[in-house]
Amino acid sequence: MRPARSLLALILTALFVTTLAAPAQAGHNPPTATVVPLGRPLSDVLLIGGTVAPGPNGKTAIWNVSSGTPAYLNAIDPATGDSLLSAPLPGGDGSYAVAAAPDGTIYAGTYYNGHLYRLRPGATTVDDLGQPLPGETFILRITLDEQGNVYGGTYPHGKVFRYDHATGAVRDYGTIKAGQGYVKSIDYWNGKLYTGSEPDAYFSEVDVDTGTVTEIPPPPGMGDPKDQVVYDLNVRGGRMYTRVSTAFPGPLYVWDIASRTWVDTIPNEHGLDISPIGADGGIYLIQASELKKYDPATKTLTGTGLTFTGRIQNARSIGYADLNLPDYPGTSVVGTLWRGEEFRYNPQTGKSEIFQTKVRREPIQILAVAGGKNSIYAGGFLNGGVSVVNPDTGEAKFNRFSQVEALLEASDGTVYVGAYPEARLYSYDPAKTWSSPEYSPGPPGTPDNPKQLLNLKPDIFQTRARALVEVDGKIAVGTVPDGDRLGGALVIYDPATGAAEKYRNVVQDESVYGLTTRCGIVFGGTSIAGGLVTTPPTRSAGTVFAWNVAAKQKLWETVPVPGAATVSSVTIGPDGLLWGVAGKTVFALSPDNGKLKRSFTLGTTTSSGDIVATSEAVYVSIDLKKIYRIAPGSKSVPTLFVEHAHSRLGVRGDHELLMTNGPDLFRIDISR
């Protein structure tokens, strides 16, 4: 970590420490909250959408959008890896959708605002063209026709639009396949659009003039389309190449448009794009961890010797460029990987390499935060990563990793990490060298640290390890299901033996969002939500449940707040009651039988908050802008303790709360 970070944290601490006094309660001195900024512990590069096209200097550049707040449209010199241009996309957080028009104009479609942006040749700032389809918050992929009109696939209503580059007029082609909320992939060819869907794998052909939708039959061997995803799709030379998988390798099916038949299947293809057809008629793609050339005429693959390692190996852009380098004469294959690396290969010399470009690192939203004996742990959303933070100075050691859903320092000092996707559980020893072969390997021979302990997708179909708690030396994991499913799980992992007890649908059709424990009993808060926001629930309210770990049975479950969809967090208070939060309501239950003891409506929204406890009080996040303190006692009432925008609330010991707001981390000192 650069020394500048700790220096910055110290300066911020000196300038911006805020002291707040909570309202006094009768007979007590009011506790004081001192909010201390600790900086931004997580930053990295995440590239999703990209293309290879003319750059700002007229020469071929690699274009990618780096995720952040805001996201940036970047042009990279493929010969040097230098940044040629970095233009913010105001309001956009990232992009799966980047494409170039025939005249060199670059377009990008973003999430979570669903806007379309345009960068004209020679410009250094983008034009925000707005949300083409009101209510569609993701533009998942875009493509262009010969005239430069832009077509895009959207979420949450699975629509396709056309943006007329000359007039700005937008045509709404409507939902392409009923019941499919995502047009996950799209490409244009000869007056037709070819699309693929999610959560189920359907293929469609759309006539751009008439809007007529024709369904394409599934390829042989694909099986049931349910819970499969048409993750990417490219049309090259009259054939549609489409991968049915996830971010990981899967079959690439080849559909011949003229004969309307499936003509080939390429196994273990990584996506996210394949190259245009080269001068020799070949197409370059990443298959089985190697850059290979595919010959459409003979349906053969030829290796290049350029291999890839790590968990994520797909191309975030791929094309051709003249590099004018000694080992790279003529035209070379160039592209980018998800963490900002460039790969390149020269067909004449066989020379290849992978190196880090100079794309800017962006701060990462903190998704998980936990206090430890000597450190604070922060885990990142989307870009991912785990940072170990000095609680006094804010100095952070960043480690590149997966998206982190939950963190826990156990009593023996081991840090457990709940990851997305595949609801993976890892153990990390902070005293040893970090080495993740999937994301950030250490020196050769370094043992894996963190170590993967569980992957809960293959057998019980889970995707998010969202909650962690230690119970009698074991680790309880609460999860959210994968894909268009309902029904999370409670998993009890024993570090001593490596055994795991897995209880799917511990509460029927509900996901497990929060966990706490007392005396060998695990208590959980659940949500009616499933794996996708489009998954229709079967129940009307979140629950709280109790599970006896030794007896391996559920003791009770209850609905504490009728109509509240999610009980997002639970904790045991200093009064021995089981406290929880469901949207705007905080409540206390008897841990023995789940009987409601206390309830307070404090907020105005249904935003999910956290609830934590010290030996003196319970602290609860309401409306993501207020933190209330509830002292023990049947007559005590919640008092406003801190008013500050935030996203997560944690605790470290008895006198520190932890608060996050986007990428920013704060320590809240509790004193009297």
Which residue ranges define each predicted feature?
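Conserved beta-propeller blade signature
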Residues: 61-64, 105-108, 149-152, 192-195, ...
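Repeated scaffold domains used in trafficking and secretory/extracellular systems
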Residues: 44-53, 92-99, 136-143, 180-187, ...
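Short loop/turn segments that connect beta-strands within beta-propeller blades
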Residues: 77-81, 120-124, 164-168, 207-211, ...
